[in-house]
């Protein structure tokens, strides 16, 4: 049976050809290799039509133009040559579109990303809607790749090399007005007139490319270009620590095209695309993409979720304010905050105001939309307005009696169907639900700070939580724009449990004489966004170390931290960034300066700060403990799958995405190698490095956690 066409041609009475893109049976338009023959057949008809005046590409999907190329195509390539051929096929197709003798216009509504933007760049003009769903970008770098269908060559010539490099190197997505300002699109119109406006543009001569700004013209010359690539190369190397080969290749390919001409540029682009597709970094990043897509589809349980019409929040602190913001402004749900202190409510409201006002200032949001979203948030010092809330999120202090009291109050003041979700980071959910009259409606919903930025949430059912409560809480987390993983109700849950030994080991190395900045730099070089000591300063030393006794009580001495160090630091009133006193020095607010370690830290912990370990040795000690604990969590069914374990670590603590998560990283090293490293470390530093039983068994049998493909588990 012949596949239904994703591209259909309709020539209007005014001799404008409208090519409608609608991939059958899919919510999103993505480009597949097999569509090339369909497009070529249409191009042949267009060339033969001597009456033709212009061509318009438009999508039939309600919220996307083309979301990119189908990533599975890359996974199907076995060699760099096959992936290179895929890129050349894309380049050729775009060249044929560009070579049409009449004006070709892309009418863009919704996401226009990756191969979708490359198709739009091959057109002679672009028009897009002013809808918030409309975004344009080349996100291939986030998959360890570069744009392979001409994007590295066309974009710099259209909008200037420095602006294009920023887009391609970061995967940054532009809104309609930004795209217009930069010259990426020729006009922005309401969705209702998009097609007609594009048709009118197609009836005119080809849109002439607007002159580049003076700065971009200077940077396009040999001297300016040399300076630009040197500066951008340095900045990129600092940011990626050399862990992402795609960024280096992007710079190389763009420079080749500008220095040697487009023909050499296209050759370099296709070759680099093929080689990058085979790198372990790209394979790991693609695996994270597939895993996060799967997690977002996972309902959490087999039961249907209950309706969600409104939410309540207990506690107007930093977490409560952040949760209120994502509930109202991302999920679009009315939210009511209860705090015993009116000041707490004011803080929570101000938090949302600050977030939204920032968007208004950056012109990402209209003032009227800011006001509409803020109107969804209200506050109270009692339970008025809570009677019919579907779900209550508790974000009060980490105190078991207080949280149990909150459960009792919610059961007394809210409806019989109301779910109680605790944002605890360390207390067992079963204990919080111990005196509940409806324990099946009590669950953990653990957000990470800052709430609006951290993509992960842990959903923690206790033994008596109902399947519907799980499904409803997962549904809310997704509405809030989060990636939820369901974890078992054991001390530390998953993320904090694997993070604690990593941070403990960093503190232990401090006591051995390693310097703060050396430890942090070693882990940043390894691929973490910040080092463990800086992370402790950011989350709060008091908050970050509070969980250690809980974990030590549950799992034994492998979780013990050098107690004298922690107490010495806390007794010196050092809580980190929040009180301006931590391991690092904090200047006046608003001043940006390079982080400096507070030299008073070393006498406080009784060392000179004269370390002996190399950066790889420092990283090895911290990371191996994290890997070992992640495997224990899988063994104890704290996480449901290695997929959830990898996603939890990457999205929850910034485990290096180019390594694919703890389980994929163990696979890349081999279980045998991990066991050998840990046994060596156990001999040197003690029994906390003893590899867990499952790793030892896997090393004997030569097993791995993942199969070879990006999405399959063993």
From Swiss-Prot:
Molecular function per GO: 3-hydroxybutyryl-CoA epimerase activity; enoyl-CoA hydratase activity; long-chain-3-hydroxyacyl-CoA dehydrogenase activity; NAD+ binding
**According to its UniProt record, where is this protein mainly located?**
cytoplasm
Q: Does Lipid metabolism count among this protein's keywords?
A: yes
Q: Which NCBIfam families match?
A: FadJ, PRK11154.1
Pathway connected to this protein: Lipid metabolism; fatty acid beta-oxidation
Q: Which organism is it from?
A: Escherichia coli O17:K52:H18 (strain UMN026 / ExPEC)
User: What Gene3D superfamilies does the annotation carry?
Assistant: 1.10.1040.50, 2-enoyl-CoA Hydratase, Chain A, domain 1, NAD(P)-binding Rossmann-like Domain
Which biological process annotations from GO are given for this protein?
Answer: fatty acid beta-oxidation
Query: Which gene name belongs to this protein?
Result: fadJ
Keyword Membrane among record annotations: no
Instruction: Check the record and name the InterPro entries matching this protein.
Output: 3-OHacyl-CoA_DH_CS, 3-OHacyl-CoA_DH_NAD-bd, 3HC_DH_C, 6-PGluconate_DH-like_C_sf, ClpP/crotonase-like_dom_sf, Enoyl-CoA_hydra/iso, FA_oxidation_alpha_subunit, FadJ
Cite the EC number: 4.2.1.17, 5.1.2.3, 1.1.1.35
Q: What is this protein called?
A: Fatty acid oxidation complex subunit alpha
The text of the family note is: In the N-terminal section; belongs to the enoyl-CoA hydratase/isomerase family. In the central section; belongs to the 3-hydroxyacyl-CoA dehydrogenase family.
Gene Ontology cellular component terms for the protein in this record: cytoplasm
Name the domain of life.
Bacteria
Site Important for catalytic activity: list residues. 118, 140
